[in-house]
Amino acid sequence: MTSALLSLSALLAASALAVPAAGAAPRNDKPAAAPAGWETVDGPELARFAGADGRAQAPAAAGRSASARADDSGTFALKSVRNGKFTATEKNYAAPNTGVLRARSAAVTGAWEGFAFEWHEATQTYALKSLANNRYVAVEGNYAGNSQNILRARSTGAGTWERFTLYYNEDLDRWALQSALNGRFVAMENSYTGSLQYALRARSLEVTGSWEQFELFEITG
């Protein structure tokens, strides 16, 4: 398996807000087997990718907690293949969308676009902690409508809601995330409008194309 940690560009974008409806019980589907052409990447493998990659890396993101965990596999930025934008934590959005994740930044400019990937050996999954607000990313399985299964950095601890399997496709040089809560792959909602445009949701049964594919950039410094 070769590394897919890439180099960066420049500039950022802004954001606003929206209010999703609550309701609907979360799905507890067992995560599917690795899709054809994709393989799971564990914590040690991801750490080796970060250390061995020869290409340029993202600039350091300010605001990372000093109490990095021993099982921290690295700090990364997620770039959507669908729209070419980096994922940011909307920490200034009002409830119930505070901390929603959107692929809306043209560049990694700081903590907004940074996420610590924490490997959990017992479950063979990752928890993603936002550097913007020091909260873990959760899948909102109880939200309804277009906001169901949206990703928000809002948790102080990591359980099933906050755990993901990381996949890599060597032929495509792309990454994908699968929620442990509902077994769905994370997709970027390119067709949404308003303040939830480009939001990330765990809603796809499989990796069908660029909607579910991401590039991974290591943040160093």
Where are the regions that the model predicts?
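Secretory targeting and sorting signals
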Residues: M1-P26
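Lectin-like carbohydrate-binding module/patch detector with strong preference for beta-trefoil
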Residues: R27-G221
